């Protein structure tokens, strides 16, 4: 009888242990859906609990703060979908999201801060303004986030004041009805030396800092000047007023054979709609980082920490990819399945733009040369 009681008790303990384990590992419904939709190995989420293990004081503080104000570039619908697991995990934090353009995310917030007004708690994609925030010592140190060490040191600020939450490739979109794969340039020099891309077949947008600046930094100013002159003088590209996304749409419509630069996630969206769009990266592959940062004077510091830490966790990274094809920066997720058009990116030499170039003499020289061509009727004559 005693043996039977012991067996029953042992079995009950085992069942309770299993239930407890299942409860601890249970994922938000939106996360489960994302893993299923992307056909991912659930083991990729191993370690998530440790990444989200924040101090109790942060949780208690966030409950008192009740909200966090976030500025970014996502469409409101995308942001709502992307952050569903966060809201399930932290229902006591209201996410107030404000979609803003470059100036809104950058200088407007900084000017307001200098006037004693705090407009947001968390900002994303502030590359063009990050140096000004650094000079003003306006950003909080994020080293204390459990997720800080998830990210390669190449993708975080040396002083810990920002972390990358995604990578962006700045390559070429092309029309697959008009361009064959074998005609695509292997290097950037191949592009400007191939007449097939001349006579208006290439559309340029006025965003040289997104792709060309990193190449100037990689190869030097002598190469950069020669390449820039060849780009305009040899190819005579269409100089378009549209933004990156709209120009990619014009490629799909057949307005020109290719556009430069084009974000990989925009091209991927057109492909999923059945448009005749491909994506190609000459070597080296230009990469820009999208930062996420917290204002040091944030009135919702604990809620802001929770949000940023979640964004760079395995779960946050996978949800960004599932929602808008964002490429993860998490060390454990550097896998081809997370890279749109992996066949033209994975295995190639890459060049991550050093954002210090944005306030460098190199950028000044590149911009002056670029603008001299961009604003001229037919481009300046060679010196």
Residue ranges and their predicted role:
Residues 167-170, 229-234, 238-241, 245, ...:
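Periplasmic-binding protein-like
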Residues 8-18:
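Bacterial N-terminal signal peptides
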Residues 286, 290-355:
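Mature extracytoplasmic/periplasmic domains
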Residues 129-133, 257-276:
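A ligand-binding cleft/hinge motif common to bilobed small-molecule-binding domains
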């Amino acid at each position: 009888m005693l043996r039977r009681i012991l067996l029953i008790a042992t079995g009950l303990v085992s069942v309770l242990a299993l239930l407890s384990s299942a409860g601890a590992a249970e994922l938000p419904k939106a996360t489960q859906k994302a893993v299923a939709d992307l056909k991912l190995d659930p083991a990729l989420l191993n370690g998530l609990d440790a990444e989200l293990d924040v101090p109790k004081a942060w949780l208690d503080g966030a409950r008192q703060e009740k909200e966090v104000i976030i500025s970014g570039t996502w469409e409101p619908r995308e942001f709502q979908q992307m952050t569903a697991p966060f809201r399930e995990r932290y229902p006591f934090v209201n996410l107030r999201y404000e979609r803003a353009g470059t100036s809104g995310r950058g200088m407007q917030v900084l000017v307001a801060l200098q006037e004693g007004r705090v407009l947001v708690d968390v900002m994303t994609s502030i590359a063009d303004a990050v140096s000004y925030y650094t000079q003003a010592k306006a950003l909080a140190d994020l080293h204390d986030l459990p997720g800080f060490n998830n990210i390669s040191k190449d993708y975080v600020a040396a002083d810990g004041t920002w972390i990358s939450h995604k990578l962006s490739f700045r390559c070429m979109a092309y029309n697959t009805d008009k361009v064959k794969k074998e005609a695509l340039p292997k290097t950037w020099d191949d592009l400007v030396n191939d007449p097939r891309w001349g006579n208006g077949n290439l559309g340029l947008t006025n965003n040289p800092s997104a792709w060309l600046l990193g190449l100037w930094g990689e190869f030097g100013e002598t190469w950069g000047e020669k390449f820039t002159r060849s780009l305009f003088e040899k190819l005579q590209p269409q100089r378009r007023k549209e933004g990156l996304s709209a120009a990619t749409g014009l490629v799909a419509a057949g307005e020109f054979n290719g556009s430069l630069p084009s974000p990989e996630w925009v091209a991927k969206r057109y492909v999923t709609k059945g448009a005749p769009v491909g994506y190609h990266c000459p070597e080296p592959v230009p990469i820009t980082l999208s930062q996420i940062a917290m204002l040091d004077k944030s009135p919702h510091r604990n809620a802001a920490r929770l949000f940023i830490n979640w964004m760079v966790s395995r779960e946050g990274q996978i949800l960004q990819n599932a929602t808008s094809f964002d490429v993860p920066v998490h060390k454990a997720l550097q896998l081809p399945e997370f890279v749109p058009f992996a066949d033209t990116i994975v295995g190639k030499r890459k060049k991550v733009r050093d954002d210090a170039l944005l306030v460098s003499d190199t950028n000044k020289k590149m911009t002056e040369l670029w603008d001299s061509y961009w604003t001229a009727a037919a481009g300046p004559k060679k010196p």
